[in-house]
Design a protein with these regions (language model features):
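Residues forming anionic-ligand binding surfaces in small-molecule and nucleic-acid pockets
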Residues: 293, 438, 525, 636-652, ...
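Conserved, structured C-terminal
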Residues: 597-601, 605-606, 619, 706-708, ...
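Acidic, proline/glycine-enriched N-terminal capping motif
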Residues: 550, 557-690, 695
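Short beta-strand segments
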Residues: 30-32, 280-282, 396-398, 698, ...
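Residues forming the flavin
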Residues: 2-597, 747
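Structural motif
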Residues: 27, 78, 392-394, 614, ...
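Well-ordered mid-protein domain cores that form the structural environment of catalytic cofactors
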Residues: 677-728
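A short, contiguous, amphipathic alpha-helix enriched in charged residues
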Residues: 42-52, 662-679, 764-769
């Protein structure tokens, strides 16, 4: 073994790193050096670092196990301060100049973790201990046990600072998506690209080629690494191909949509100006999964010591990165592929201490100078912070500083399960392969499909691409797959060493042992799903990529059945962890929940309005004027001015839905409780819609502007939910109806003009072609109009205040100009602008229901609108609204309340009790929903629900708030405090 500098004692010559670009980095405060093209893991291996972390439960020493994204042990925090990223796999994190990394999940130094005391408590922390321990004494649950468990939970820690990195999102479309750029993926991508199809080739690695980068294969007489880079270069030069390295396709969703995470900046020093990662939504017509396979470990005594690695990972570090995991290496393999590790190490001058193969018979090859033990197994290991010796089942001890383990290969089939697909067991390769339920449009090639030889991968990639092209109508390729080394893939199922006397680890991150699996069987948790949750097998950040099959095999043996009979769990997205920042993209802070501003917002700011958040809207709450001593005085003035003269309020936030089509009237008839089939053109009608369970969903008005044209308004809070509900009805319930919907909430500015002088004010703004007289434009009329000399608009004569009122609408871009024109026209009448507070006061005075009266539990009967329910037609929720429990004679009814002592103030949330009854649930008769001080009446008023409310007008009951020690008498009255006959709004 030759070293390439004293700073990297385990660095070999060769490899695919750029030695012209050395890079300094730190690990746990110690300075090291690597090269461009290294991962953090390969650089640590080159520097002789074996101990990199601690396990989750027992805090046992952990080293690097793999060389890819399946890594369960080497989880580090990369970066510092706000840029720190916990739980980063060292095996995929690219090295860059100045990188800082630190180990995690330990207290005290990594080499002396005080939490390692948990290992001595392992008899009390076995599988399912959390169901059986900490049960007594009860007082300790929250005071002792929970704080103890929570302080011990987790792996890496967040910085506690806002993430300064930028993330982005994007959409891509292609004919063929190739997932994985190994030999099968490169062959599939090239075949598809030559046909003229639009191709996306995505791979999680920064160097495309898959296992070819780590092996000594030849393809068409040239090194596999060279062949791969030639194909990548050829694809990169083609206009119809997008090559995406550093891109993990993490999820397969409906309709050929795939989620992908591209790490565009993780290999560079932190830079807050450029995106760190991009989340892609890829729309593909066909997808070919060429994700390769993952090597499995073998469970044997103390198989978790640092320095024990997968055989393929050892080859990767030696061949790709020129880093030696050890100086004296033993290989423990159950298959022919593992023997190739011995050959590659020997070729690089690394001493082979022994090759151990549990299979009987002759050795597949004779590594130079190595001892061979056929029919034997590694039963145990020694070493504190790294392996120093192995013990064979035959009793022989062999000193080593690295052990390469190969228990066979498991195809990377996770994406095939994301739509409930279930794999099948193949006995010849002792692995699960894709079978039923593969996402539509997906095919699988290469090792991911069980084709473990290089030649089969190349051939399958070509064939699956041709099949996809044929399905899409493209010309298929007549070329044959290139010729390659044809290696043996013979394997004998062998999952754990029964002769081991010490703990044998199955899931190294979550500290699940063979004994834990057997204990789960003993205690009745034998289903694969129960096994997973009882032992936490496969529930770590790696989702059991290296552990699941071993655990399932042990459970199958315990049950006395075969592995396919035992079954397997399936996978769900994401394939590897996706940062929450990437899912959010640019939607952070106010970009996540931006304020929606009304068209009159700038004008309202000029008037000194106080604003309030109403959902995502910023609405003017009230408009204080010089001399106003309090907000109440301002609101009282706005209400009084409106009722005595005229007031204007921006009601743009009300949901507006444009409904058109030949069957629009029938559609409305089916969603509203009252009839809309005979609504005349130029008329507006109040309506209420129910949920399917008969509960009131929303109320509002719908105006008929033309024979097939309607405009619906909804409450501000329910604008989105109602639109989604209507779209569901249109698309799923009645797709045969000719009706089309579009939300126009943001497209129209709308203002309520209310008060006795509202008609006079509008006559100065609305163009004279529109007759605004009571006869020409009566209550509930609507019309398309023009204003201010030809600007198109709409006018509705509806009232939320109980006064003569209109709502005038113009395209949103004219909203600011319209509010200024309205206020200018109203100066001679002493017009006032009013906000949401005055709006709320007037609606309570008039008895209109709003959000507080529509909490999702009330019915039309409760709201006093039972008479609106049409008996001549059906509608959504009609049948269930007739349930006896919803129509009880003693049910809740909406009524008004006023204090017997007019000087007392009411508050929402108070409960009603009969006079003389104790304040308990048994005697509770209802609650107060909305309250306001009425300047028109001079005292506090409220709306609320009380049992048999309609029959109890004038009755005195108690309004009680035990939380604030309030107990006063209130009188039940009509909810219509102002103009109960509705005369004002019809003048």
């Amino acid at each position: 073994m030759s070293s390439n500098g004293s700073r990297q004692p385990n660095r070999l010559s060769g490899g695919l790193v750029d030695r012209r670009r050395p890079m300094d980095f730190t690990f746990n405060g110690n300075r090291f050096q690597g090269y461009q093209g290294d991962t953090v893991a390969s650089a640590l291996v080159a520097n002789g670092v074996k101990l990199v972390g601690r396990s989750f439960k027992y805090h046992r020493p952990r080293g690097i196990l793999t060389a890819g994204s399946e890594e369960p042990n080497a989880l580090l925090t990369i970066g510092r301060d706000a840029y720190a990223e916990p739980n980063t796999r060292a095996t995929v994190a690219e090295l860059y100049e100045g990188l800082t990394a630190k180990s995690q999940n330990h207290r005290g130094p990594l080499g002396f973790d005080v939490m390692a005391a948990n290992d001595f408590l392992s008899p009390f922390l076995s599988a399912g201990f959390y169901y059986k321990t900490f049960m007594w004494p009860r007082a300790f649950w929250e005071k002792v046990y929970e704080p103890l468990i929570r302080s011990s939970a987790g792996l890496g820690a967040l910085s506690g600072q806002p993430d300064p990195s930028k993330y982005d999102k994007g959409f891509l479309h292609c004919d063929v998506l190739v997932i994985g750029a190994g030999p099968a993926g490169l062959m599939a991508a090239k075949t598809a690209a030559l046909s003229g199809a639009r191709v996306i080739l995505a791979d999680e690695d920064f160097r495309l080629g898959g296992r070819l980068n780590s092996e000594t294969y030849e393809i068409d007489g040239k090194p596999g690494q060279t062949w791969a880079q030639e194909i990548v270069h050829e694809l990169s030069e083609m206009d119809n191909v997008r090559v995406m390295p550093r891109t993990t396709v993490y999820g397969a969703y409906d309709h050929g949509i795939y989620g992908a995470l591209e790490r565009v900046g993780d290999h560079l020093p932190p830079n807050g100006d450029k995106p760190r990662q991009v989340l892609w939504r890829i729309y593909s017509k066909r997808a070919i999964l060429c994700a390769g396979a993952i090597e499995r470990p073998i469970a044997f005594g103390d198989n978790d010591r640092p320095g024990i690695m997968l055989a393929s990972a050892v080859r990767s570090y030696v061949n790709r990165w020129g880093a030696a995991p050890g100086k004296r290496v033993a290989i423990f393999t159950t298959n022919d592929d593992g023997w190739r590790t011995a050959a590659d190490l020997a070729a690089r001058g690394i001493e082979i201490a022994a090759v151990i193969d549990p299979r009987k018979g002759d050795a597949p090859q004779k590594p130079h100078g190595a001892q061979v033990f056929m029919g034997d197994a590694v039963a145990g290991t020694y070493g504190r912070k790294g392996i120093t010796q192995i013990s064979l089942a035959s009793g022989r001890d062999i000193p080593v500083d690295c052990l390469a383990v190969s228990g066979g290969w498991s195809p990377n089939l996770q994406l095939t399960c994301h739509q409930r697909g279930r794999p099948a067991w193949r006995e010849d390769i002792a692995a699960f392969v894709p079978d039923q339920g593969i996402p539509p449009g997906m095919s699988v090639a290469g090792a991911a499909n069980g084709g473990l030889s290089l030649q089969s991968a190349l051939t399958e990639g070509l064939n699956k691409a041709n099949t996809a092209l044929q399905d899409l109508g493209f010309k298929t390729s007549p070329q044959a797959a290139p010729k390659s080394d044809d290696e043996s893939t013979a394997v004998t199922p062998f999952f754990y060493v029964k002769e081991s006397t010490s703990r044998a680890w199955v899931d190294q991150q979550n500290d699940v042992t063979v004994k834990d699996v057997k204990l789960a069987h003993q205690e009745g948790f034998r289903s694969v799903e129960h096994l997973k949750r009882y032992t936490t097998l496969g529930m770590a950040t790696d989702q059991g990529k290296t552990a699941n099959v071993v655990g399932l095999a042990i459970m199958a043996e315990q049950r006395g059945i075969s592995i396919p009979e035992a079954g397997t769990t399936i996978f769900r997205p994401p394939y590897t962890p996706v940062p929450i920042g990437a899912l959010a993209g640019r939607a952070r802070g106010k970009d996540f929940r931006p304020y929606r501003l009304t068209p009159s917002h700038a004008w309202a700011e000029e008037q000194g309005a106080t604003f309030v958040e109403v959902g995502m809207w910023m609405r003017a709450q009230y408009f204080p004027k010089p001399g106003d001593k309090s907000w109440r005085e301002t609101v009282d003035r706005e209400v009084s001015t409106t009722r005595n003269s005229v007031g204007i309020c921006d009601v743009t936030t009300l949901g507006k839905i444009d409904i058109q089509g030949r069957d629009a009237a029938e559609f409305l008839n089916r969603v509203y409780i009252n009839g809309f089939a005979k609504l005349a053109v130029g008329k507006t009608r109040y309506g209420m819609m129910l949920r399917e369970d008969g509960i009131a969903m929303d109320d509002g008005t719908t105006a008929r502007l033309g024979e097939t044209h309607y405009v619906m308004t909804t409450t501000t809070a329910n604008a989105g939910p109602v639109f989604r509900h209507l779209e569901f009805c249109r698309q799923c319930l009645w797709p045969d109806l000719d009706v089309h919907l579009i939300s126009t909430t943001d497209g129209w500015a709308q203002f309520a003009v209310a008060g006795p002088n509202s008609r006079k004010l509008l006559q100065k703004v609305v163009d004279p072609e529109t007759d605004l007289s009571n006869e020409g434009f009566p209550f509930m009329a609507c019309s398309e109009i023009t204003v201010c000399g030809g600007t198109p608009g709409r006018l509705f004569r509806i009232s939320f205040s109980g006064e003569l009122a209109y709502e005038i609408a113009v395209p949103a871009r004219y909203g600011d100009a319209l509010i200024r024109a309205l206020m200018k026209a109203g100066e001679e009448f002493g017009v006032t602008a009013y906000g949401t507070e005055a709006l709320g006061v007037m609606r309570i005075e008039k008895g209109h229901a709003a959000g507080a009266e529509l909490p999702g539990t009330t019915t039309a009967q409760d709201l006093g609108m039972g008479g609106m329910v049409s008996k001549k037609k059906d509608c959504i929720g009609n049948t269930l609204s007739e349930r006896p429990e919803l129509n009880r004679e003693d049910g809740l009814r909406l009524v008004g309340f006023r204090p017997v002592d007019r000087g007392q103030q009411l508050k929402a949330g108070w409960h009603f009790l009969p006079k003389g009854a104790p304040a308990d649930m048994t005697h509770d008769e209802g609650w107060m929903t909305s309250v306001a001080f009425s300047p028109s009446l001079g005292h506090s008023i409220g709306l609320g629900f009380i049992k048999r409310g309609g029959e109890r007008m004038g009755e005195i009951v108690r309004a009680v708030s035990p939380a604030t020690n309030v107990d006063i008498e209130v009188e039940i009255v009509s909810p219509h405090f102002i103009d109960p006959e509705g005369e004002r709004l019809r003048v």
